[in-house]
């Protein structure tokens, strides 16, 4: 069974909820990442000097990660696979020494952040939709890394 229109709609509507409180959701996202993988702090230039704070760079990067996952959902619905529009993403992830476990940490933080953003609208279906979309994005990035 492929990615469904309902899953795409769930990701789209919850992405809009995420963006409504971008500053706080961005801080939450990176706080969750650093709780699981403190060493990841050095992978993000905007986190090196301090922890997650309300900074334009942090917000822009969080919006990019969530936006790429949103785009992955649309691609999965349209063509059943994810291709990267930015060919440089693989190289950046190689340069930062991103490994498989890092993708799992980001996925967990992403899901918890979406859950916080949507509140009582959180459901297993919503979790699955975001999880599948993120897995598609992660697979495309890993492919570009090799």
UniProtKB/Swiss-Prot annotation:
The gene is LB1. Leghemoglobin that reversibly binds oxygen O(2) through a pentacoordinated heme iron. In root nodules, facilitates the diffusion of oxygen to the bacteroids while preventing the bacterial nitrogenase from being inactivated by buffering dioxygen, nitric oxide and carbon monoxide, and promoting the formation of reactive oxygen species (ROS, e.g. H(2)O(2)). This role is essential for symbiotic nitrogen fixation (SNF). Nitrated in effective nodules and particularly in hypoxic conditions; this mechanism may play a protective role in the symbiosis by buffering toxic peroxynitrite NO(2)(-). Nitration level decrease during nodule senescence. Phosphorylated by CCAMK at serine residues in a Ca(2+)-dependent manner; the phosphorylation at Ser-45 disrupts the molecular environment of its porphyrin ring oxygen binding pocket, thus leading to a reduced oxygen consumption and to the delivery of oxygen O(2) to symbiosomes. O2 binds at residue 61. The modification Nitrated tyrosine is found at residues 30, 134. Pfam families: Globin. Its main location: cytoplasm. The modification Phosphoserine is found at residues 13-14, 45, 55, 123. Monomer. It is found in: Cytoplasm, Cytosol; Nucleus. Disruption phenotype: Normal growth and flowering under non-restrictive nutrient conditions, but classic symptoms of extreme nitrogen limitation under restrictive nutrient conditions, including severely stunted growth, increased root/shoot ratio and delayed flowering. Following inoculation with symbiotic rhizobia, accumulation of free oxygen at the expense of reactive oxygen species (ROS, e.g. This is Leghemoglobin 1. GO terms for molecular function: heme binding; metal ion binding; oxygen binding; oxygen carrier activity. Keywords: Cytoplasm, Heme, Iron, Metal-binding, Nitration, Nitrogen fixation, Nodulation, Nucleus, Oxygen transport, Phosphoprotein, Transport. GO terms for cellular component: cytosol; host bacteroid-containing symbiosome; nucleus. Heme b binds at residues 45, 64, 93, 96. Belongs to the plant globin family. Induction: Accumulates in developing root nodules upon inoculation with the symbiotic M.loti strain MAFF303099. One of its GO terms (biological process) is nodulation. It comes from the Eukaryota. Residues 2-146 form the Globin domain.
């Amino acid at each position: 069974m492929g990615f469904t229109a309902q899953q795409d709609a769930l990701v789209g509507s919850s992405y809009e909820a995420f963006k409504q409180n971008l500053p706080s959701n961005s801080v939450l996202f990176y706080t969750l990442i650093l709780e699981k993988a403190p060493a990841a702090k050095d992978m993000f230039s905007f986190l090196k000097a301090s922890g997650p704070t309300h900074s334009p760079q942090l917000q822009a990067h969080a919006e990019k990660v969530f936006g790429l996952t949103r785009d992955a959902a649309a691609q999965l619905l349209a063509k059943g696979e994810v291709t990267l529009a930015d060919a440089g993403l693989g190289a950046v992830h190689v340069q930062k020494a991103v490994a498989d476990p890092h993708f799992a940490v980001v996925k967990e933080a992403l899901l918890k952040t979406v859950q916080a953003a949507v509140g009582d609208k959180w459901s297993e279906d919503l979790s699955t939709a975001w999880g599948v979309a993120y897995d598609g994005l992660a697979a495309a990035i890993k492919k570009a890394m090799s």
